[in-house]
């Protein structure tokens, strides 16, 4: 089964917790802190595997959670970094953040990789908090939470040339006669329901990959029929071969077909109109084809070059292939996405940390709820089993301006304050 779009959940591993420990060595009084740092959590890394052709595997496994880092140990020993979780994807996979719509990666070549969810850093052990005024601190951090997000995977086939047109205009037949591909061919619409790829040899030491894309109908750009499912595969092609049925057996006007398909391409993605398009008048072996072709030429004008062919008899096919090969030699790759720079993704939730660091709301029972990436991250990294860590967290809240903001919202001694699922009393 061909699957070209799927939604999955990914989570980087949490960092390991730092440790509170002290040196216990004979004849060394007050040996000092010796708690090690936690190890970094594993990243979730997507890697291109050229043998894969579909996203089918992701229908059965939709959650990918990387391992956390090892906790810090005594004697100043740091925890081990967790091994990255490798997720293999087929060439042509685009990874998109489901919440923001941001393109995280466009994975094309074998072995290409991208970090999709970063692991959290390890928490610091108590040796990191030693100061002249506090030489033996009882403070250690929990590991930083790993990045988590829902992502959309879209597979856009890798082909140099895309065959487009209405259903049953002869796209699959054309692909079958110019390559070794064997797409399903039958006398009914939408026989082709998945893209078929074939390698075309022109006979003069040139070759290219051609994709037979399922037929389009009016409204495809808005999802009519299987519109979006098909149109996304055209985006990677460099040359579009527009196949038109000149026989008239379907009862449609060839010129109206031509206008409709071009409009669908334009409405779906305006950049598709930048690609060179070769217009193919197919089924020229049929009785009324020549008459229909002349009428078509009068309507499109002399600017549009038309290649009359018969995919069944192979009439005109050789000239068509040479024209396509010539166009490919002068047509560059078209970038289909603006992929986020590495600098944009190297800091977790960078967009959320810019601007307001926290938000305060009040529930119907009077409870103050504090939310925001910075405060929630600080909360998760605090070890509340140790008094010094609790006092440090209180100082951090004051430093962020949360105490002052709560007073401004009317908070008084004894009022309940909630962060995530935890509640505590406000002390003024």
Curated annotation (Swiss-Prot):
Residue ranges of every copy of the OBG-type G domain listed in the record: 159-329
Principal localisation: cytoplasm
EC number(s) per entry: 3.6.5.-
Keyword rRNA processing: no
UniProt xrefs under InterPro entries: G_OBG (IPR031167), GTP-bd (IPR006073), GTP-bd_Obg/CgtA (IPR014100), GTP-bd_prot_GTP1/OBG_C_sf (IPR036346), GTP1-OBG_CS (IPR006074), GTP1_OBG_dom (IPR006169), GTP1_OBG_dom_sf (IPR036726), OBG_GTPase (IPR045086)
Described purpose of this protein according to its UniProt entry: An essential GTPase which binds GTP, GDP and possibly (p)ppGpp with moderate affinity, with high nucleotide exchange rates and a fairly low GTP hydrolysis rate. Plays a role in control of the cell cycle, stress response, ribosome biogenesis and in those bacteria that undergo differentiation, in morphogenesis control.
Subunit structure: Monomer.
Name under which the protein is recorded: GTPase Obg
Species classification: Bacteria, Bacillati, Bacillota, Bacilli, Bacillales
């Amino acid at each position: 089964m061909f699957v070209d779009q799927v939604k999955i959940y990914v989570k980087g591993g949490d960092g390991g917790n730092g440790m509170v420990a002290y040196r216990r060595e004979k004849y060394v009084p007050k040996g000092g802190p010796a708690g090690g740092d936690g190890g970094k959590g594993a990243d979730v890394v997507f890697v291109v595997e050229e043998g894969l052709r579909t996203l089918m595997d992701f229908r059965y496994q939709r959650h990918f959670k990387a391992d956390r880092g090892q906790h810090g140990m005594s004697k100043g020993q740091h925890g081990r970094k967790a091994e990255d979780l490798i997720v293999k994807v087929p060439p042509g996979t685009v990874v998109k953040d489901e919440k923001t719509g941001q393109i995280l990666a466009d994975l094309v070549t074998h072995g290409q990789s991208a970090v999709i969810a970063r692991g959290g850093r390890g928490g610091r052990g108590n040796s990191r908090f030693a100061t002249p005024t506090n030489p033996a601190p009882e403070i250690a951090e929990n590991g930083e939470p790993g990045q988590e997000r829902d992502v959309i995977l879209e597979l856009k086939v890798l082909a140099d040339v895309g065959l487009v047109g209405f259903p049953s205009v002869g796209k699959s037949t054309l692909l079958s006669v110019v390559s070794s591909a064997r797409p399903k061919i039958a006398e009914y619409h939408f026989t082709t329901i998945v893209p078929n790829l074939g390698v075309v040899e022109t006979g003069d030491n040139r070759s290219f990959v051609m994709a037979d894309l399922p037929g389009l109908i009016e409204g495809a750009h808005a999802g009519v029929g299987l519109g979006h499912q098909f149109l996304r595969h055209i985006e990677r092609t460099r040359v579009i071969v527009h196949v038109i049925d000149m026989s008239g057996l379907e009862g449609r006007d060839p010129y109206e077909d031509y206008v409709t398909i071009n409009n669908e391409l334009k409405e779906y993605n305006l950049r598709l109109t930048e690609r060179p398009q070769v217009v193919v008048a197919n089924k020229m072996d049929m009785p009324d084809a020549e008459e229909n072709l002349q009428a078509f030429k009068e309507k499109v004008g002399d600017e549009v070059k038309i290649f009359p062919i018969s995919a069944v008899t192979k009439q005109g096919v050789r000239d068509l292939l040479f024209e396509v090969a010539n166009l490919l030699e002068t047509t560059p790759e078209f970038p289909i996405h603006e992929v986020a720079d590495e600098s944009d993704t190297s800091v977790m939730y960078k967009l959320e940390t810019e601007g307001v660091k926290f938000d305060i709301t009040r529930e119907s029972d009077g409870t103050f709820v504090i939310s925001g990436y910075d405060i929630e991250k600080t909360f998760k990294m605090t070890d509340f089993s140790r008094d010094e860590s609790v006092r440090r967290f209180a100082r951090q809240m004051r430093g962020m301006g949360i105490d002052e903001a709560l007073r401004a919202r009317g908070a008084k001694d004894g009022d309940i304050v909630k962060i995530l699922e935890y509640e505590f009393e406000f002390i003024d």
